[in-house]
Amino acid sequence: MVTEWARNYIDYSGLKKELKSRQSGADKTKEWDDVDESHFLKRLQEELSKVYNFQEAKIASIFSQLSENDQSVQELMENKKTAKDEEHQASGQAEGDESDDEDDELDAEIEAKFEEIEADLEILIADVHDLSKFTHLNYTGFVKITKVSPSAVQS
């Protein structure tokens, strides 16, 4: 469970407590009725919406960051090509020690920027992995809570 996302997970224990309190009632013989069903389904829908909205926001954020990284890579590649073309034109297409040093500096700068992008992508991969676990855990919670609800038993 990702601690920072805790409030976005299904409130399984809260839903289960609510089920138990509605089933037992004051006299311990209360039958599950339409009011109980309606209230439980409303709470279940609220939980589902909470989880869904969080997932959608995280997915949008991940895609946005991927797009930004893709754009950065495209710009780096274009800048590298442009800079090398300009260097070769300025030096009259001659390859010399000075030109090689400038190429090495340019390559080092580009390599450093690529490493930054790689680090960003590693974080995104971890976020995708965490989101996958989040989805699986919530799915399991929804399946379990609907199986133990009286409406599932009565059906």
Predicted regions, residues:
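Activation on extended, non-transmembrane soluble regions of large proteins
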Residues: 1-155
